[in-house]
């Protein structure tokens, strides 16, 4: 029975028993403290805790889950996996223990031809909580052999949330796999032979003061008792399919089969290699499912977990002997295996695959550059009589070559050495400390504690008025200078930081740049406000230039923002929301915000997307925004509960912390765009005028950036573009509507000229072959060196072809080195070197020769022993480089 059919039977059974079947929730956990959905009951926690009313009091689901705490153990055993599916039935104040036990037993033991799972009742064992005589009696009533009902304590068979809330005893169902898997005696005796497949939790107590599983306080019984069960789908699958473990099931093993074909190895021949096969099978599936829920590789949070899964896959395949890209084979294989259960995988697969392929390409380059350095670090340690790779070397691998410490640790373990992790962590901490110090210096401060100390003196929070007021009367609460605590007074000219009791100035946040303006005191002090920041939560600090007079603490002032700048930034910020919405309409819901900057007349928007959107797609985004501008949609703001905002469909940033009450900015009466946002906006989008997308490019793995001009910036761009078109039309003697055709014609002519020039260079190279061969053969030196400065050579392929041609004609009668150097189309010097087998037997390697020659040219290079290439910056030293190379070759 296929895994998808096992899941379907579970859901069909409980639907027939009046349960509402709900689809799996996203793997992205709604809880900001948890990266992923880690258990089947997670989406139902608000119902179990009594915080929300469920749509029905009986529910069932097949929930996708990811746990990566044991990622290092994956593959080493056949029981660990990062992605799994949890079947569950739930009751919220409806049925309780007796029905839950009956449902589970009936589904498990009903024959398969009658819709059940067909487990032999004699193979089933149950564990129950010490004090739960009621559950034991109910199992007996179902016909379970009393000898198969075992008793366990609080540690194993009592469930809590880990804090105050519901709790209760549980009963676990096990399957006996037979004597070849271990000793008899039930789950208490051997959990390798007896495999847990289903856990029934009976929540009937209110628990308080949970210190540990064995140290908790039961307050009393719950008014509404709940049922929370979880059956591991993968475990059910391998037992029902007659397999040995989860890796041999129909949803996982196809990836192992694909890895076998790529590697030429056979799963089961070698345990060390089997570990790699299992890592690949598990991680590819996990990565596929995580990416399908919108996560993309990054350096933090969920994105980093995903990145690690993909990188461990590539590394494991390399250890299986595969150096070419593997994701284009493995990912579609996993998708085909999982699609019967998740047909929606097809909807996002194009973007998912692009992200995975791009991540693999980047990591393969990292592996190629870092592996050699790692090997050198291991050699250095062993030559020093140590089995410890230094923390300095591990840090260099991480900092210079982008080699993740996890990969370094795994490779070290594979080679039987360790890594000085303590020193590595120390160096990482020092680097972070330097980065924080640099950031503080950029804010003209050395220590945030001065702000913390000042904030403690405030009697009430600072009042931000900037949503409605552009100027305000205020009182000076504090003056800071040179990163020191508040001073009573400062006389200008001076650079100072000013804290007011109330302010219309917007502090930089959420991508929106700060307001600028002026502060004028009643006693004559004049301050130009250049920037406004929140160095710590809820403290608004105005960074000012005191140009006239003396400012004293307690002074009454007028605070006036620059209205023109505020308006320009507000237009950009509203336009950013519109670009975000239009991108999601054009590309799909995975195009989510990763960052932004809203400045006067321009915006920058970073979004999650793995591949370059087409030019047509970006044109459509621009056109869509301008269409909405012409509709002059209203912009409204409203404060509401976070859950209510999400229910309305408001966009928010995953990983961002929000309060219970949030501010929602909506564009259009029907909420065409709706986002959680604390920034400033215009009241109607028509005031933006126009937007032009200037560029779209990658700024990192899986992250793209849009730069656009807005309002006056867009008008100025259009004027410049019109002038440029007129100028180009005059230059090529064509009307504006003929410009593209005329430029294409000129480019075609240029391409033909380049082709002829390349053919000439290639002909010249070919003509030099007979002379090079003859001169080398005539040489009496122990190593035949054929070298030449060919001048301009056109394409490097032609140079490489000539080098290999000369080597082939010189044969294997004597050691041969062929070295040609010249200038590419950019005038940069390059060198190509080939050696024959006779030379390599004497230790003469092309890579070594190229490195020496490239050093003379002021550059670098490398390659394999039989062929290598390099280059530099100083073309005047080509002859010198060739002479140095020849001398090195003759020394052997």
Curated annotation (Swiss-Prot):
Aminoacyl-tRNA synthetase listed as a keyword: yes
GO cellular component terms, semicolon-separated: cytosol
EC assignment: the record states 6.1.1.7
Gene Ontology biological process terms, A to Z: alanyl-tRNA aminoacylation
Among its keywords, does the record have Ligase?
A: yes
Top-rank taxon:
Bacteria
Return the broad EC class.
Answer: ligase
* Essential cofactor(s): Zn(2+)
Q: What is known of its domains?
A: Consists of three domains; the N-terminal catalytic domain, the editing domain and the C-terminal C-Ala domain. The editing domain removes incorrectly charged amino acids, while the C-Ala domain, along with tRNA(Ala), serves as a bridge to cooperatively bring together the editing and aminoacylation centers thus stimulating deacylation of misacylated tRNAs.
This protein's name: Alanine--tRNA ligase
């Amino acid at each position: 029975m296929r895994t998808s059919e096992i899941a379907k039977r579970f859901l069909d059974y409980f639907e027939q028993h009046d349960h509402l079947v709900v689809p799996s929730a996203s793997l992205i956990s709604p809880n900001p403290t948890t990266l992923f959905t880690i258990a089947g009951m997670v989406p139902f926690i608000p119902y179990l805790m009594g915080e929300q009313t469920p749509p029905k009091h009986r529910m069932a689901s097949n929930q996708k889950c990811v746990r990566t705490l044991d990622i290092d153990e994956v593959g080493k055993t056949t029981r660990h996996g990062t992605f799994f599916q949890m079947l569950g039935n739930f009751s919220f104040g409806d049925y309780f223990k007796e029905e839950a036990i009956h449902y589970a037993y009936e589904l498990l033991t009903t024959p398969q031809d009658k819709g059940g799972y067909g487990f032999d009742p004699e193979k089933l064992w149950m564990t129950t909580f010490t004090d739960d005589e009621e559950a034991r009696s109910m199992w007996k009533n179902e016909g379970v052999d009393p000898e198969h009902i075992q008793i366990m304590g609080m540690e194993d068979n009592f469930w809590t949330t880990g804090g105050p809330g519901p709790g209760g005893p549980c009963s676990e169902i096990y399957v006996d796999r037979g004597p070849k898997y271990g000793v008899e005696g039930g789950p208490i005796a051997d959990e390798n032979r007896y495999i847990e497949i289903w856990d029934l939790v009976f929540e009937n107590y209110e628990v308080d003061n949970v210190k540990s599983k064995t140290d908790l306080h039961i307050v009393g019984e719950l008014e509404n008792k709940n049922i929370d069960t979880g059956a591991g789908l993968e475990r059910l699958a391998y037992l029902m399919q007659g397999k040995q473990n989860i890796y041999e099931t129909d949803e996982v093993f196809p990836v192992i089969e694909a890895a076998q074909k790529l590697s030429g190895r056979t799963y089961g021949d070698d345990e060390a290699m089997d570990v790699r096969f299992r890592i690949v099978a598990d991680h590819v599936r996990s990565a596929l499912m995580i990416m399908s829920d919108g996560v993309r590789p990054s350096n933090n949070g969920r994105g980093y977990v995903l990145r690690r899964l993909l990188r461990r896959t590539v590394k494991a395949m390399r250890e299986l002997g595969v150096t070419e890209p593997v994701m284009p084979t493995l990912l579609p294989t996993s998708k085909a295996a999982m699609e019967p259960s998740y047909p929606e995988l097809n909807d996002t697969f194009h973007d998912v695959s692009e992200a995975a392929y791009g991540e693999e390409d980047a990591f393969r380059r990292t592996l190629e550059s870092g592996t050699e350095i790692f090997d050198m670090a291991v050699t250095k340690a062993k030559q020093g009589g140590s089995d410890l790779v230094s923390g300095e070397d591990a840090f260099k691998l991480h900092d210079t070559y982008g080699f993740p410490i996890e990969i370094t640790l795994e490779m070290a373990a594979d080679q039987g050495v360790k890594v000085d992790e303590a020193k590595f962590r120390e160096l990482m901490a020092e680097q972070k400390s330097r980065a924080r110090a640099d950031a503080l210096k950029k804010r003209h401060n050395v220590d945030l504690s001065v702000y913390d100390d000042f904030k403690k003196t405030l009697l009430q929070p600072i009042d931000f008025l900037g949503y409605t007021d552009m100027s305000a009367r205020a009182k000076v609460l504090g003056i800071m200078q040179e990163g020191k605590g508040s001073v009573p007074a400062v006389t200008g000219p001076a650079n100072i930081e000013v804290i007011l009791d109330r302010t219309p100035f917007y502090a930089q946040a959420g991508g929106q740049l700060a307001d600028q303006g002026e502060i004028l005191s009643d006693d004559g002090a004049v301050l130009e406000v250049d920037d406004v920041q929140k160095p710590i939560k809820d403290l608004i600090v105005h960074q000012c230039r005191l140009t006239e007079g003396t400012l004293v603490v307690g002074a009454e002032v007028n605070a006036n923002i620059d209205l023109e700048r505020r308006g320009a930034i507000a237009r950009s910020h509203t336009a950013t929301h519109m670009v975000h919405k239009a991108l999601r309409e054009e590309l799909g819901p995975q195009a989510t915000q990763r960052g932004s900057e809203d400045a006067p007349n321009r915006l920058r928007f970073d979004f999650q997307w793995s591949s370059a959107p087409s030019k047509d797609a970006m044109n459509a985004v621009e056109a869509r925004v301008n269409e909405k501008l012409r509709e002059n949609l209203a912009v409204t703001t409203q404060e509401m509960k976070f859950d209510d905002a999400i229910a309305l469909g408001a966009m928010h940033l995953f990983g961002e912390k929000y309060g219970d009450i949030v501010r929602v900015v909506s564009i259009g009466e029907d909420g065409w765009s709706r986002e959680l946002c604390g920034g400033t906006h215009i009241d109607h989008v028509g005031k933006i005028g126009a937007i032009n997308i200037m560029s779209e490019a990658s700024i990192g793995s899986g992250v793209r950036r849009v730069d656009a001009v807005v309002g006056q910036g867009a008008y100025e761009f259009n004027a410049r573009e019109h002038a440029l078109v007129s100028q180009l039309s005059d230059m090529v003697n064509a009307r504006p509507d003929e410009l593209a055709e005329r430029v294409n014609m000129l480019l075609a002519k240029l391409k033909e000229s380049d082709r002829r020039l390349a053919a000439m260079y290639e002909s010249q190279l070919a003509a030099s072959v007979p002379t090079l061969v003859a001169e080398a053969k005539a040489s009496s030196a122990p190593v035949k060196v054929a070298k030449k400065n060919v001048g301009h050579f056109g394409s490097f392929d032609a140079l490489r072809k000539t080098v290999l041609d000369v080597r082939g004609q010189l044969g294997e009668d004597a050691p041969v080195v062929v070295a040609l150097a010249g200038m590419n189309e950019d005038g940069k010097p390059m060198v190509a070197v080939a050696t024959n087998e006779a030379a390599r037997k004497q230790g003469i390697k092309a890579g070594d020769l190229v490195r020496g020659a490239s050093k003379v040219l002021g550059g670098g290079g490398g390659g394999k022993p039989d062929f290598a290439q390099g280059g530099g910056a100083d073309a005047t030293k080509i002859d010198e480089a060739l002479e140095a190379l020849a001398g090195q070759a003759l020394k052997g």
